[in-house]
């Protein structure tokens, strides 16, 4: 097959962009880029400059102010006005992007810009807006994996994007057939953040031709950068909105500004509704005819989470409304365009302070209601609507109410909000890779003819709790979870929630886990959370208050012992928040393995490091989808799906819910395939691998890069399928079961890593041109998360300093583990750790502290490396340490300090030294990280 070349693809794209209104300019180097930027800057500010273009000194002063910044800071400068003092001491404010009148910017394109900095690079197509390179397009010929283009962009970004290229907002990556966009950032950028563009009906726009015709039209790309990119002020990152988020906001804005009707947005759970609703609120609050935008949530625990998210998207945009009086004060203040509060507080404010709110009775006020299926069915909503005569209401929900799952008062979401303005269903989100599919297991735990396991209904009047909560069944399930949890969560890399039917059930399971913990070498860290009657009603089931408070106190005290905290039932909210952070952040080596709940955390709680849900209760429709969706947030390659383990027969309920909320009979688009299908796929992939290398050692003699690439691609697929197979109970890593045993897999893996190490540039070496440079090794899928630096250091601490024979056995065991290390940081520290256990450990006495000895050893080695490298490269050691310290803090090698370090060396030598220093700083920072 003959594929279109990269050059032909680039030429065709340039012509298409030109026909769409871009001006073609010839820019081949950085000086021409600066000259073009200066010319446009003068042209756009002719009036402000009074016809006097910027002088050389003035332009240099400007460059000093806007260059040398990180990506995030550059993005902030791009959207701001920059004061510049002119030579005559007058001051002028310069702007770089018109963020309100998108089409009034100047649009240009160029290609093949060369940058001759630390590394040489030539960029494919660059979109310039007002002379700044804001969009960089990287093309690969048809047939090439798009991930290779992604890796090349990431390499360029790390090595070459300096100066004005720091202003790149978006990367476009395409092989002609598959096209995606991704926001630029200072830190690591993940492939999972590459997005497809799509139309309003969520049909993907894949080809480069279609993408250029829609997404890259001048007005649209300027609008995308101006309105639909978020500066996340908490994490200091740039976020590009996904297409369905953009279409939803556009539809909502049109409905609010062009009509007086209400509406709702149906976007599946986990698709980023908070960001979408925030952007809609923000844009609406900027409209002149809208006097106030009020964002309503339902529950106290969600209020703080939503507030945190809003302030992440725009620092200080939300003032916390602690009480009704404070809310009334904020409502009276017309200078606050946006308020976040709960519908309960809003209802009280209207009931008790109606006269104070009369100013809004006829004003246009917009209410945005998050998770409206939880908050908008009831009397409170009616009270709010009666007071604001000219208000519009827009709901966001992942699980609307229909006839099948209508609210208690018999109304559907459409009955309250009217027309659905935009949909993005769970099948769409899974197809786009924005959420994960589900792998669902059903474990039969009872054999009884007296109970309907799907509905919990009595058949012959027996007590169902006696069946569901029998001691034997509860312990059976607790043991099943304990014995299979490592498999489901990839050796506890992820956490799980266990949802049960009631507080008594929660207490019984909690006690069962405590009881059996002594039977296991590595018991699970189990926590529980529930409310007693004195707390806010959370629909947790009826239970005696004194008993439940006493039990909750016991659970909290256990938590304090496990996690070094000091909570009690008197500080329940703080306890709740700490658990939330623990499960959300995934604190390494000190996280909750299983959190037992009744209803808490099953709605509105997002955690990327949660991948498993254990279920022992009846769930259906919206409750089932909401609960399942706690597990399906995208993280990285090691989390291919959300794992659901049902201890009741919820098969029909699962199918019904998925059909309703996917609007399809085809549930296979949401559920992962079964074990046999993955096994068959694995057998085929293994045959492909054997065709390339029948035995692992066959790769030892291979020199040809194409053969190495074929091996990498074949083994990578085998590894991905092993990762999926391991999540199934049927999996057995034996030749009889899947045609390969674990030792053979490890042998192939060592050859895979050998090629990876060969391709990875060594410190100070000039990077070789190789077809393997940009291949995606996806090292994450091969990592045994348990055997990492922390795990090895634990073993080192346990080395016997008294018994020399036992000490030798300990050291041999650690050495074997180091030889097979697949954790990247551990591989960097491997030689360091070997030297420590071989040279230092034998010299220690019983009285010595291994931790202290290692810290002294590592500090000395680090100091020695700095000294040797500084001498080799003839650079100042202290400046080198300063650059490293700054990199460890910010993740950026400061180019100004780098120039200072290399001094007056010749151009070629300067380039080589810069490259060597950059590699040294990155490697030594990772190697000696704690």
Curated annotation (Swiss-Prot):
SMART domains on file: DEXDc (SM00487)
Source organism per UniProt: Staphylococcus saprophyticus subsp. saprophyticus (strain ATCC 15305 / DSM 20229 / NCIMB 8711 / NCTC 7292 / S-41)
TM regions (residue ranges): none
Gene name of this polypeptide: hsdR
Keywords carried by this UniProt record: ATP-binding, DNA-binding, Endonuclease, Hydrolase, Nuclease, Nucleotide-binding, Restriction system
Protein origin, superkingdom: Bacteria
Leftover remarks: Type I restriction and modification enzymes are complex, multifunctional systems which require ATP, S-adenosyl methionine and magnesium as cofactors and, in addition to their endonucleolytic and methylase activities, are potent DNA-dependent ATPases.
Gene Ontology biological process terms, A to Z: DNA restriction-modification system
UniProt name for this protein: Type I restriction enzyme SsaAORF53P endonuclease subunit
InterPro entries: Helicase_ATP-bd (IPR014001), HsdR_RecA-like_helicase_dom_2 (IPR055180), P-loop_NTPase (IPR027417), Restrct_endonuc_type1_HsdR_N (IPR007409), Restrct_endonuc_typeI_HsdR (IPR004473), SWI2_SNF2 (IPR040980), Type-I_R_enzyme_R_subunit (IPR051268), TypeI_RM_Rsu_C (IPR022625)
Record function comment: The restriction (R) subunit of a type I restriction enzyme that recognizes an undetermined sequence and cleaves a random distance away. Subunit R is required for both nuclease and ATPase activities, but not for modification. After locating a non-methylated recognition site, the enzyme complex serves as a molecular motor that translocates DNA in an ATP-dependent manner until a collision occurs that triggers cleavage.
Subunit structure: The type I restriction/modification system is composed of three polypeptides R, M and S.
NCBIfam families cross-referenced by the UniProt entry: hsdR
Binding positions (ATP): 268-274
Family: Belongs to the HsdR family.
Entry's EC annotation: 3.1.21.3
Residue span(s) of domain Helicase ATP-binding: 254-418
Catalytic activity: Endonucleolytic cleavage of DNA to give random double-stranded fragments with terminal 5'-phosphates, ATP is simultaneously hydrolyzed
Molecular function (Gene Ontology), one example: ATP binding
């Amino acid at each position: 097959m003959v594929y279109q070349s990269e050059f032909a693809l680039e030429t065709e794209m340039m012509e298409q962009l030109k026909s769409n209104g871009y001006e073609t300019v010839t820019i081949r180097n950085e000086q021409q880029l600066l000259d073009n930027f200066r010319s446009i800057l003068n042209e756009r500010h002719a009036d402000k400059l009074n016809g006097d273009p910027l002088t050389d000194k003035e332009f240099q002063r400007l460059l000093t102010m806007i260059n040398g910044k990180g990506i995030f800071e550059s993005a902030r400068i791009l959207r701001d006005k920059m004061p510049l003092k002119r030579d005559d001491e007058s001051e002028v404010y310069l702007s770089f992007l018109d963020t309100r009148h998108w089409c009034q910017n100047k649009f240009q394109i160029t290609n093949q810009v060369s940058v001759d900095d630390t590394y040489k690079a030539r960029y494919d197509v660059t979109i310039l807006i007002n002379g700044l390179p804001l969009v960089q397009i990287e093309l690969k010929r048809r047939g090439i994996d798009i991930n290779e283009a992604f890796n090349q962009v990431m390499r360029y970004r790390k090595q070459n994007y300096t100066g004005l290229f720091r202003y790149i907002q978006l990367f476009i990556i395409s092989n002609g057939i598959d096209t995606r966009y991704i926001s630029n950032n200072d830190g690591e950028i993940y492939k999972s953040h590459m997005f497809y563009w799509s139309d309003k009906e969520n049909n993907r726009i894949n080809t480069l031709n279609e993408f250029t015709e829609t997404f890259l039209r001048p007005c649209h790309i300027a609008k995308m950068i101006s309105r639909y990119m978020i500066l996340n002020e908490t994490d200091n990152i740039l976020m590009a909105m996904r297409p369905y988020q953009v279409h939803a906001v556009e539809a909502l804005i049109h409905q609010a500004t062009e009509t007086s009707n209400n509406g709702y947005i149906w976007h599946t759970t986990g698709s980023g509704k908070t960001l979408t609703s925030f952007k809609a609120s923000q844009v609406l609050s900027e409209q002149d005819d809208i006097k106030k935008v009020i964002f309503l949530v339902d529950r106290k625990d969600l209020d703080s989470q939503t507030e945190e998210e809003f302030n992440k998207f725009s620092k200080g945009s939300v003032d916390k409304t602690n009480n009704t009086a404070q809310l009334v004060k904020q409502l009276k203040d017309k200078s606050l365009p946006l308020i976040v509060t709960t519908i309960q507080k809003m209802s009280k404010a209207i009931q008790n302070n109606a006269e104070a709110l009369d100013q809004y009775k006829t004003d246009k006020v917009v209410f945005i209601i998050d998770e409206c299926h939880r908050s908008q069915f009831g009397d409170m909503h009616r009270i709010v609507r009666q007071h604001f005569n000219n208000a519009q209401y827009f709901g966001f929900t992942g699980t609307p109410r229909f006839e099948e799952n209508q609210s208690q008062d018999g109304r559907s979401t459409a009955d309250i909000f009217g027309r659905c303005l935009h949909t993005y269903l769970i099948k769409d989100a899974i197809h786009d890779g924005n959420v994960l599919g589900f792998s669902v297991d059903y474990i039969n735990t009872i054999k009884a003819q007296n109970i309907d396991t799907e509905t919990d209904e009595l058949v012959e009047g027996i007590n169902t709790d006696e069946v569901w909560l029998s001691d034997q069944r509860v312990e059976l399930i607790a043991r099943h979870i304990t014995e299979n949890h490592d498999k489901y969560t990839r050796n506890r890399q992820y956490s799980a929630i266990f949802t049960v039917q009631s507080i008594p059930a929660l207490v019984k399971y909690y006690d069962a886990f405590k009881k059996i913990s002594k039977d296991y070498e590595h018991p699970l860290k189990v926590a529980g959370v529930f409310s007693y009657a004195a707390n806010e009603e959370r629909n947790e089931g009826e239970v005696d208050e004194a008993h439940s408070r006493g039990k909750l106190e016991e659970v909290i005290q256990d938590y304090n012992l496990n996690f070094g905290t000091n909570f009690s039932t008197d500080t329940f909210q703080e306890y709740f928040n700490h658990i939330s952070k623990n499960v959300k952040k995934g604190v390494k080596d000190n996280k909750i393995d299983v959190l037992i709940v009744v209803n808490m955390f099953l709605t509105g709680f997002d955690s990327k490091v949660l991948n498993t849900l254990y279920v022992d209760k009846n769930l259906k429709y919206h409750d089932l989808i909401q609960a399942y969706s706690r597990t399906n947030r995208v993280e990285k390659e090691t989390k291919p799906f959300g794992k659901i383990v049902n201890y009741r027969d919820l098969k029909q309920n699962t199918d019904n819910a998925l059909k309703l909320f996917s609007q399809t009979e085809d549930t296979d688009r949401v559920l992962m395939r079964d074990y046999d299908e993955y096994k068959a796929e694995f057998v085929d992939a293994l045959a492909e691998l054997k065709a390339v290398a029948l035995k692992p050692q066959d790769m030892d003699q291979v020199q040809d890069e194409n053969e190495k690439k074929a091996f990498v691609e074949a083994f990578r697929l085998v590894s991905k399928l092993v990762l999926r197979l391991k999540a199934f109970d049927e999996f057995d890593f034996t030749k009889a079961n899947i045609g390969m045993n674990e030792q053979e897999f490890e042998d192939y893996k060592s050859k895979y890593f050998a090629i990876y190490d060969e391709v990875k540039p060594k410190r100070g070496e000039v990077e070789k041109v190789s077809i393997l440079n940009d291949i995606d090794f996806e090292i994450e899928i091969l990592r045994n998360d348990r055997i990492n630096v922390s795990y090895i250091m634990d073993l080192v601490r346990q080395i016997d300093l008294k018994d020399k024979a036992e000490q030798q056995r300990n050291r041999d065991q650690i050495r074997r583990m180091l030889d097979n290390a697949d954790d990247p940081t551990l591989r960097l520290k491997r030689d360091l750790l070997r030297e420590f256990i071989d040279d230092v450990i034998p010299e220690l006495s019983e009285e010595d502290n291994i931790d202290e000895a290692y810290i002294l050893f590592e500090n000395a080695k680090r100091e020695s490396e700095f000294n040797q490298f500084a001498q080799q490269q003839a650079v100042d050691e202290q400046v080198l340490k300063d650059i490293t310290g700054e990199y460890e803090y910010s993740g950026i090698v400061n180019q100004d300090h780098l120039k200072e370090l290399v001094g007056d060396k010749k151009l070629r030598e300067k380039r080589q030294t810069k490259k060597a220093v950059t590699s040294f700083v990155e490697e030594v920072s990772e190697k000696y990280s704690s």
